[in-house]
Structures are given as C-alpha cells and as structure tokens.
Amino acid sequence: MTKRNVPVYNGTLRNHSIRLPHCIRECSGIRIFGMRIKSIAFTTDVAIIKNINADAIIAVYPFTPQPAISQAVIGISDVPVFVGVGGGITGGDRSVRLAIEAENQGAFGVVVNAPISNEVISRIKEVVDIPVIATIVSDQMDIRSRIEAGADFLNVSGAAATPQIVRRIRAQFPDVPILATGGPNEETILETIHAGANAITYS
C-alpha cells in the first residue's frame, strides 16, 4: 500500500509556532472520549497553548490549584486539557472539590500529585467521570495501590529515570495507560516510548 500524501497548510501569521518532535507520533496514544492523544504539552502559558501543535495540554503548576486558572487554560485551549487538582499541600476535600469543578469546566482528566493518599484518589474517582491521572515519580512507589484506588492513567515524571520507571511499570501492568515525560531530545523521547509509554508530555 502506497503512503498517502497529507496536504499541509500553515498560513503566514501562524507559521511561526512550536512544533513538537515528530518522533512522538511513534507512540500508541491514549484514546479518551474518542480522541487519540499522543503528545501533551506541559504548560499553563496561554501564548504557548495557542501556538503549539500538541494533542493536549497538561496544566500542573507549583502553586495551590485554583479554578480560575484551570478555567482560563481550558477556555483558551483548542485541544483537551488535563488539570492538576493537588495532592501535596492541597489535598483531601479540597482536591475532591477541585476535581468536580475541573470536570464541570470541561477538563478531559484530573492529575493528582505523588503525595496524594489512595483514599483521596478513590473519593475523586467516585465523583468524576473523567480520567484520574496519578503522578509517579519513583519506581519505589506502590503502583498497584494507586490503580486499585481508582487511578485510570499513570503520569510518570522521574527525570532521567523516567524510561526505567516506565519499563518497570509496563512489565507489571501491561495494559495500564502511561503518559510520561520524554526528556530533552528525540533519543530520550524514543527511549521512553520503547519502554512502554503510550503518550509523551513535553515542555
């Protein structure tokens, strides 16, 4: 079968934009509500969000999650947004309420930080119908308990150790959806994909 040519239109004014590494297209992707997502931009910068070709946005930032911020990001984005709802300093009832609010705003999923308790993951899963995404920062974490608590996807963010963590998770849980940081270049991205990541977060 011959490969079909894909017509491209970049325009003039929008031609200057951020293009993610093409090798990300090699991962399987994760299908959410009928949309297949392979590349996820890690940013809350509205100018970048409007000028990047990622399939989705992950809006996690080092401050207490605020509905006004998630609403702004979701409102400006042309692609699905995964919203951080805490799990460290912000947790418990507040994280549960933030998850409900994020779903009502149109988020495609909620992301919880590594320190969050399994109890709160379960409580969030009970009240939202969008994916609950648990952040994994070490292969020493109890992955099984996260999944059993209700985490639908795993978000692996282990810096240089990310491929190793992904590989270990994939060996134990062949079917769990994994999104993972791809690192600074195509070599590290491909290593993460070959380790078993279904989607790549990029910053």
Language-model regions, residue ranges each:
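Alpha/beta catalytic cores of nucleotide-metabolism and tRNA/nucleoside-modifying enzymes
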Residues: 2-16, 28, 179, 185-203
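Active-site-adjacent beta->alpha loops and helix N-cap segments on the catalytic face
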Residues: 61-78, 90-95, 113-129, 139-143, ...
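Glycine-rich phosphate-binding active-site loops on the catalytic face of alpha/beta enzymes
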Residues: 105-116, 152-165, 195-203
